[in-house]
């Protein structure tokens, strides 16, 4: 009996000492130390067991964790150690994500190009003599211009071409033209060979023994013949007395271009002999950019203009132009949002557009309406717009070589959705599937790296598709925003649009999407 009383006294003293100790120390009897757990890590186990018939206190939870289980009771009559408390559960996981949208598409300086080399009625390629005609057809949008070049044969390096602005194929109100455009054509000196008297000089194209011969011009700039004072100065007839150029709209966005070598085209040399003036085969190009073939008052580009202007040979220039022809696809400003996994905030594949602003991005590259609607979208957690390219002081689309970035915090159960227009189209946009991209896997590991394979080209179904970069209602050619014919009526993968026979790039060939996590 005395021994039992001593044991009780001893236990009471021990309890008092434990109460004065630190929170995480082990305590005797019922005052077991509490287990602690940091954020994102398990709490430690409980303290030592309590006294007889008393369960040890469970380990307390770490920050945002689950408390450990209580310790087991000691044996009756014995101040044995109680069971240890269980470990606290893991705290919630969070990470900071930076998303980069980079335009990796090639840049094309021309929309299309070609060669004209066979006069109408002839069976073989060759120059056009007076009375003969070259014809070719171009496909062009409202913002695109016509360029061409053909040599004035019997000279050293003279050629006919429009100036650097090209020839507009539409009026300002969008009406396609049918007109005589000769007044927009000039006679140019390529600046690559010193001028001699036409038809007489030893290195003029009709007299030279081989191609690319003659004296180097002392002025190497491309310039209009009326300003040339170097070499043999000759009074050439007016352009309209030598050739006639007409453009005729045929249908849709197609135009037929006719270059007539006038039957009266001739010049008289110093020996008072009148010579007919043939035209050489040439090249044509359609572009929305200026100076598609050359730049006035700059040296001729080293990609074939010299061979055309000196020898009437378009092959080298044609090959160069062909490698630079195609469509340049910018990506537009857009909107992004973080949302609960399982929600479909921006659209549902196969269903009509929600009317929350996706149409404005898909048709016009305008993220403002969708940005203003984000908080009302299904599963919305946070979001915003991206409209300023990295390194730029102003908002705008990203051409090839540029990128957008945006940053946010996310936790398991969160997904990412975004939309950005494939510019040069009617209503095509980049985006993940309608459920978005989950940002954590089943083990709560954050998604990182290149996620381009999870991004697709979608058709918003709000506007009928036309030929990219050419159609009158594509974003680069439309006269006003939100114009065009009715669309398919549902959001769907672009590849699923059966009424569209035009060619498009893959999403990954234009937009590279990566995620960095910290």
Locations of regions flagged by a protein language model:
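Ser/Thr-rich, Pro/Gly/Ala-heavy low-complexity intrinsically disordered linkers and tails
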Residues: 15-92
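Detector for intrinsically disordered, low-structure N-terminal pre-sequences
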Residues: 7-8, 41, 62, 496, ...
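Structured domain cores in non-transmembrane regions
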Residues: 93-178, 251-254, 263-434
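Mature, soluble, non-transmembrane domains
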Residues: 130-250, 391, 397-518
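Glycine-centered secondary-structure boundary/capping sites
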Residues: 27, 312-315, 365, 484, ...
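Compositionally biased regions
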Residues: 15, 31, 37, 42, ...
């Amino acid at each position: 009996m005395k021994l039992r009383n001593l044991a009780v006294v001893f236990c009471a003293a021990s309890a008092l000492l434990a109460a004065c100790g630190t929170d995480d120390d082990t305590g005797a009897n019922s005052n077991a130390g509490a287990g602690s757990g940091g954020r994102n890590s398990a709490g430690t186990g409980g303290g030592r067991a309590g006294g007889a018939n008393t369960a040890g206190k469970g380990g307390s939870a770490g920050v945002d964790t689950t408390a450990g289980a209580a310790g087991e009771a000691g044996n009756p009559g014995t101040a044995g150690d109680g069971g240890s408390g269980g470990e606290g559960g893991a705290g919630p996981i969070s990470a900071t994500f930076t998303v980069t949208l980079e335009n990796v598409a090639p840049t094309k300086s021309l929309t299309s190009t070609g060669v004209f080399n066979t006069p109408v009625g002839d069976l073989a390629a060759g120059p056009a003599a007076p009375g003969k005609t070259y014809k070719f057809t171009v496909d062009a949008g409202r913002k695109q211009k016509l360029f061409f070049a053909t040599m004035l044969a019997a000279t050293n390096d003279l050629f006919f071409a429009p100036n650097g602005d090209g020839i507009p194929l539409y009026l300002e109100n969008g009406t396609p033209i049918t007109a005589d455009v000769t007044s927009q054509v000039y006679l140019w000196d390529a600046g690559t060979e010193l001028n001699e008297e036409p038809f007489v000089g030893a290195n003029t194209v009709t007299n030279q023994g081989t191609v690319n011969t003659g004296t180097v011009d002392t002025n190497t700039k491309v310039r209009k013949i009326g300003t040339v004072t170097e070499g043999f100065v000759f009074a050439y007839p007016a352009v309209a007395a030598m050739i006639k150029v007409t453009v005729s709209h045929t249908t849709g966005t197609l135009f037929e271009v006719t270059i007539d070598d006038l039957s009266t085209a001739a010049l008289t040399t110093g020996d008072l002999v009148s010579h007919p003036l043939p035209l050489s085969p040439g090249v044509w190009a359609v572009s929305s950019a200026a100076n598609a073939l050359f730049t006035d008052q700059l040296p001729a580009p080293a990609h074939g203009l010299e061979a055309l202007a000196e020898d009437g040979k378009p092959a080298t220039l044609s090959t160069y132009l062909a490698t630079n022809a195609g469509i340049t696809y910018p990506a537009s400003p857009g909107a992004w949002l973080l949302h609960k996994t399982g929600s479909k905030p921006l659209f549902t594949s196969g269903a009509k557009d929600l009317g929350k602003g996706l149409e404005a991005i898909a048709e016009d590259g305008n993220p403002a309406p969708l940005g203003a609607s984000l908080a009302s979208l299904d599963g919305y957690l946070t979001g915003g717009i991206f409209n300023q390219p990295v390194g730029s002081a102003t908002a705008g689309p990203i051409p090839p070589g540029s990128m957008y970035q945006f940053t946010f915090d996310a936790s398991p159960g969160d997904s990412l959705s975004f939309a950005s227009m494939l510019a040069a189209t009617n209503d095509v946009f980049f985006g993940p599937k309608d459920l978005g991209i989950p940002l954590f896997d089943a083990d709560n590991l954050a998604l990182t790296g290149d996620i381009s394979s999870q991004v697709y080209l979608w058709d918003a179904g709000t506007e009928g598709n036309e030929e990219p970069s050419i159609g009158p209602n594509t974003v680069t050619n439309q006269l006003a925003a939100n114009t065009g014919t009715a669309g398919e009526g549902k959001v769907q993968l672009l590849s699923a649009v059966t009424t569209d026979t035009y060619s498009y790039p893959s999403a990954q060939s234009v937009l590279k999407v990566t995620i960095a996590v910290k």
